[in-house]
Amino acid sequence: MTELKNDRYLRALLRQPVDVTPVWMMRQAGRYLPEYKATRAQAGDFMSLCKNAELACEVTLQPLRRYPLDAAILFSDILTIPDAMGLGLYFEAGEGPRFTAPVTCKADVDKLPIPDPEDELGYVMNAVRTIRRELKGEVPLIGFSGSPWTLATYMVEGGSSKAFTVIKKMMYADPQALHLLLDKLAKSVTLYLNAQIKAGAQSVMIFDTWGGVLTGRDYQQFSLYYMHKIVDGLLRENDGRRVPVTLFTKGGGQWLEAMAETGCDALGLDWTTDIADARRRVGHKVALQGNMDPSMLYAPPARIEDEVATILAGFGQGEGHVFNLGHGIHQDVPPEHAGAFVEAVHRLSAQYHS
């Protein structure tokens, strides 16, 4: 077993005792940091940054040099799998990710390959191995993937969407085609995450960014069902240590009980869910991650500290809480406000772990 100097994050996910509440931030390696912008400029474009193991490692480590974070998260993108399937990923200025060959029908789905994680996605595994080496056992490394539903939204819509009318048309008019796509994606995500674990990821997270746009019935059928399949197929132990799995559906606070039944170790909460209520509902089954509104980081540090105190009190005494934002950090947040947030979590949480 590789020695970890700080295993708070892994212990909290398994609802084991810790000295203080662990904290990390979604998108902690990102554009709010001037050093990230410099490395991104050096890479040339976003996907070149993802595909260069040394540069991906550098931006992964940047926030850890600034803040005493309790975990590192692989620097990558959720759209690596659709890109490896040959959909022609590119980034349009001001538009976000786009695909030159979106999925429009069952025939398109039939043609999609299931990518080999050590071949077409080998650059991700190289990044994982490089980051693990450079972390030198300081903190654990989180691997991740998008959920099948969330990946499918981009693949069918051809990019980002506000209304999701194209994929919902497929969902209601040709559900068989969508289920075939989701099944293929579930197999791809399972292989991809297991390869990340074998390469050195010590915990994995599934980001279901767009599950919250579905009705309850559709969420069960088109999103949660496939995440459950992935959880069932994941390696849960590696290098002599349990590998915790976190599910995060943005806008999914009403479905926590169903999510907790998947066999995952933890659930991510966005800021619209009350953490005290979430703990009452599912805290006996899973750990909880979250859940400060990312926009709170625009506030003065004293106000950030008040919000941290409120969320810690909401979760209350005992184990099973990883502090995080309710979604990714915004790109124009002052870096010192992020530092105040991390410091406040550690300082104010000790009283809950005595």
From Swiss-Prot:
Coarse class of the primary localization is: cytoplasm
Keyword Lyase among record annotations: yes
| GO CC list | cytosol
Keyword DNA damage tagged: no
What Pfam families does the annotation carry? URO-D
| Enzyme class label | lyase
Q: Which Gene Ontology molecular-function terms are recorded? A: uroporphyrinogen decarboxylase activity
Q: What is its EC number?
A: 4.1.1.37
Site described as Transition state stabilizer, located at D77
The subcellular location is: Cytoplasm
The record, for PROSITE patterns, names:
UROD_1, UROD_2
Its UniProt pathway annotation is:
Porphyrin-containing compound metabolism; protoporphyrin-IX biosynthesis; coproporphyrinogen-III from 5-aminolevulinate: step 4/4
> InterPro entries from the entry?
UROD/MetE-like_sf (IPR038071), Uroporphyrinogen_deCO2ase_HemE (IPR006361), Uroporphyrinogen_deCOase (IPR000257)
Q: HAMAP family under this entry?
A: URO_D
Q: Which NCBIfam families match?
A: hemE
- Its biological function? Catalyzes the decarboxylation of four acetate groups of uroporphyrinogen-III to yield coproporphyrinogen-III.
Q: How does this polypeptide assemble, per the annotation? A: Homodimer.
Q: What is this protein called?
A: Uroporphyrinogen decarboxylase
| Organism name | Salmonella paratyphi A (strain AKU_12601)
